[in-house]
Swiss-Prot record:
Protein name per UniProt: Glycogenin
Predominant cellular place of this UniProt entry's protein: cytoplasm
Pfam family, one: Glyco_transf_8
EC annotation from Swiss-Prot or TrEMBL: 2.4.1.186
Residues holding Mn(2+): D107, D109, H213
GO biological process, one term: glycogen biosynthetic process
Cofactor(s) needed: Mn(2+)
Source taxonomy: Eukaryota, Fungi, Dikarya, Ascomycota, Pezizomycotina
């Protein structure tokens, strides 16, 4: 339908297929109220199916596709427990519909008690009703607006930056129209709650209610018809929604009703039961005995399908309130490995194919192999799989068992004959477990001569050493044992026999590398030039030379005159001292190191028992009250500095404890005598 420039419309928004029942009930409630205004709905084509669009076109005058605007910062949506509102910013596309003069926007979860056509006469640019959760804010479920691109671009910039205190459209619009919106009466956007209702106010203003808004995630079509069956105020409001739905979609068996009932909980199940009931009533009595079995089968099929239709759809709804954990329905089938160790024996004849197949079965097996397709099929190796021989018959087995004693007797009568490699029929019965005969002493590559030669080359030096040691401690052995030992043991999987393997110690010895014998492949490398032989190398002498060389090097590098320039290298070149340019007297090089005069440490004095040493003289002078000289003339200390005047130090005035006590500690002024020892007690007591 062509849009008339400057007309007024009721508009709604559909973001997914799940809100189809709400959008249709809203349109029908406005039509039933007698409005003559056009109805428009904004949809996001990427989230709406074609069958849903067809249903909207039967009720709405304009179906307008718009672009989805999502919130990339949905943290505040989780605070409200409404992550489904991540695309609520799409609502700002209403201001982009400048082909309309005035738009009365109504959410798809609203049912109209009456059509509020008087809202189109408001002179304000934007009007909205207060929110029940915070009345200082307005609710964006019902709005009256005048489309303009200025507000659209301003709110689009806020949406792109995620500016919204609740993460949804209501926070964004309240921040944009904070001081410029016109406040509507609460009767234009009554938001009931199942937990709280101001019942006296509802009874008083019940006759003036215009629009009823079901906020939250639990919509009437999501809860189902049987969820609210009481007589409370909230149940009465939900009943108004179901009244409009039943007036247009209940009891009709057409394609439109089937599409709508698919999104309403419990309605598809009731529709199937009603169809089944109608078919059973219309069935002629003459044909009842012919189709009795068919009815039983169809009833079972319908019951299974009904339970599936009434089940919870996780892609559209939240889990039911009284649902049980889904883990109880997990399959409990357990598979175990077969414990049968018997080899597979193919049957003598396979069953014949059925005769009533649509394709023709070949009468004989094909004699020619199919042509190869892949390259590896042309050069495929010969199969090496060995199939078990059929078990011997009972008669042959008994004959072999009777012949066993004679074979044993003949073998005992000729002890000088060497045993043959062919096995004789065993005298002991076979074990019940066939895996006992399995051996791992041989591999397929043990008989390849190239591998044997390669292993012999690697172990040649070991065998030569072992042969030499064996020759030194050889002793006479039997011919059979000598023949068995002369065999080359190049097989990797062979394990030495009891005679070949030595007695192992309790503590394992470390593994040593291979050593070559003196007479075989021994090679001496020439000595390097300038490197002494090992016998001529003395570590102590070399360390002493290194210490002397280091001392000489340090003395050469440390030569420095007392005054004048600095010595550089071993040549002793001096840098002449010269004055710095004017203004650069205080400048210092980054690598300059401050030179301090040498400080002489006090030298220890040798003990002197005659009482004439310097220490005793200092103490004597101190007692007499004289000055204590810092330096004496008895010991002359060489000093590179110029002669300085003698410095005297006054005696200390502190008379407290010595250095053994810390500051703040007390020192004893008197002593307490100790108790007598046991020996002294014995003397005193006697």
């Amino acid at each position: 339908m062509a849009i008339t420039k400057g007309e007024d419309v009721y508009a709604s928004l559909l973001l997914n297929d799940a809100y189809l029942p709400g959008a249709l009930v809203l349109a029908h409630s406005l039509r039933d109220s007698g409005t003559h205004k056009k109805l428009a709905i904004l949809i996001t084509p990427e989230n709406i199916s074609n069958e849903v669009v067809e249903q909207l076109q039967t009720v709405y005058d304009y179906v307008i596709p718009v672009e989805t605007i999502q919130n990339d910062r949905p943290a505040n949506l989780f605070l409200m427990n409404r992550p489904d509102l991540h695309s609520a910013f799409t609502k700002i596309n209403l201001w982009k519909q400048t082909q309309f003069r005035k738009i009365v926007y109504i959410d798809a979860d609203v049912v109209a008690y009456r059509a509020p056509d008087e809202l189109f006469d408001l002179p304000h640019a934007f009007s909205a009703a207060p929110d029940i959760g915070w009345p200082d804010l307005f609710n964006t479920g019902v709005m009256v607006l005048s489309p303009n691109m200025g507000d659209y671009y301003a709110m689009l910039a806020m949406a792109e930056r995620g500016i919204s205190f609740d993460g949804a459209d209501q926070g964004l619009l309240n921040m944009h129209f904070r001081n410029t919106y016109n406040r509507l009466s609460f009767t234009y956007n009554v938001t009931p709650s199942a937990h709280y209702q101001y019942i006296p106010a509802y009874k008083h203003f019940q006759s003036s209610i215009n629009l009823l808004h079901f906020i939250g995630s639990e919509k009437p079509w999501v809860q189902g018809r049987t969820q609210t069956t009481g007589s409370s105020t909230y149940d009465e409001m939900i009943g108004r929604w179901w009244a409009v739905y039943d007036r247009h979609y209940r009891g009709n068996s057409n394609k439109t009703t089937d599409v709508v009932q698919k999104f309403v909980k419990g309605e598809q199940q009731q529709q199937q039961q009603q169809q089944q009931r109608n078919v059973s009533f219309q069935l002629p009595s003459s044909q009842s005995h012919k189709t009795q079995s068919h009815q039983t089968q169809s009833q079972n099929t319908h019951s299974t399908y009904t339970s599936h239709g009434a089940s919870w759809d996780a892609s559209r709804h939240s889990p039911p309130a009284g649902s049980k954990p889904e883990a109880a329905n997990f399959p409990q089938t357990h598979y175990t490995m077969s414990s049968n160790t018997q080899q597979f024996v193919p049957p003598a004849r396979y069953p014949s194919p059925p005769k009533d197949m649509w394709y023709k079965v070949p009468e004989a097996a094909p004699t020619q192999k199919p042509a190869p397709i892949f390259p590896w099929e042309k050069q495929a190796p010969e199969p090496t799989r060995v199939f078990p021989e059929p078990p011997p018959e009972q008669g042959k087995l008994s004959a072999a068992s009777t012949a066993t004693p004679s074979a044993v007797a003949s073998a005992t009568a000729s002890p000088t004959l060497e045993p043959k490699s062919e096995a004789v029929t065993p005298t002991t019965p076979a074990s019940a477990n066939p895996w006992t005969s399995f051996t791992t002493r041989g591999n397929a590559w043990d008989d390849v001569p190239e591998i044997n030669r390669y292993v012999d080359a690697l172990q040649k030096h070991r065998r030569s050493g072992s042969k030499g040691s064996a020759a030194a401690t050889s002793r006479p052995t039997s011919p059979g044992r000598a023949q068995s030992r002369s065999r080359k043991s190049s097989r990797v999987t062979d394990f030495p026999t009891e005679d070949d393997r030595p007695s192992l110690p309790v503590t394992p010895a470390p593994i040593q590398g291979p050593r070559s014998s003196r007479g075989e492949n021994e090679r001496q490398f020439p000595a390097a030039a300038g490197v002494p032989a090992q016998s001529e190398w003395n570590p102590a002498v070399q360390l002493e030379k290194l210490a002397i060389h280091q001392q000489e090097t340090l003395q050469k590098l440390g030569e420095r005159p007392a005054f004048g320039g600095l010595a550089i290298g071993t040549a002793g070149k001096e840098i002449p001292a010269r004055a710095l340019p004017f203004g650069s007297e205080d400048a210092r090089s980054p690598t300059y190191v401050t030179q301090y005069p040498s400080v002489l440490s006090p030298k220890p004095l040798r003990a002197n028992t005659t009482g004439t040493n310097s220490v005793r003289r200092i103490l004597t002078i101190d007692e007499e009250g004289g000055d204590v000289p810092l330096t004496t003339t008895e010991k002359k200390t060489p000093s590179p500095l110029p002669t300085q005047p003698s410095v005297t130090t006054a005696p200390p005035s502190y008379q407290g404890p010595g250095v053994a006590f810390e500051k703040g500690e007390d020192f004893p002024t008197h002593e307490t005598p100790a108790l007598p020892t046991e020996e002294e007690r014995d003397v005193l007591e006697t």
